Amino acid sequence: VIGGDECDINEHRFLVFLTXASGLACGGTLIN
């Protein structure tokens, strides 16, 4: 997991498209 944590996708709905399109876990690299 890129962000170092497992994320609840329901808490990160705005990242769903990022996760699906880029394969990022919770958009960790984008958040950081």
Curated annotation (Swiss-Prot):
Subcellular location: Secreted
UniProt GO MF annotations: serine-type peptidase activity; toxin activity
Domain annotation Peptidase S1: ranges: 1-32
Tissue expression pattern: Expressed by the venom gland.
UniProt keyword Coiled coil, yes or no: no
InterPro entries: Peptidase_S1_PA, Peptidase_S1_PA_chymotrypsin
Gene3D superfamilies for this protein: Trypsin-like serine proteases (2.40.10.10)
Keywords: Disulfide bond, Fibrinogenolytic toxin, Glycoprotein, Hemostasis impairing toxin, Hydrolase, Protease, Secreted, Serine protease, Toxin
UniProt KW Disulfide bond keyword: yes
A GO cellular component annotation in the UniProt record: extracellular region
PTM per Swiss-Prot/TrEMBL: Contains 6 disulfide bonds.
EC identifiers of the protein: 3.4.21.-
One annotated GO biological process: proteolysis
Family (UniProt): Belongs to the peptidase S1 family. Snake venom subfamily.
Oligomeric form and interacting partners: Monomer.
Protein name: Snake venom serine proteinase
UniProt lineage: Eukaryota, Metazoa, Chordata, Craniata, Vertebrata
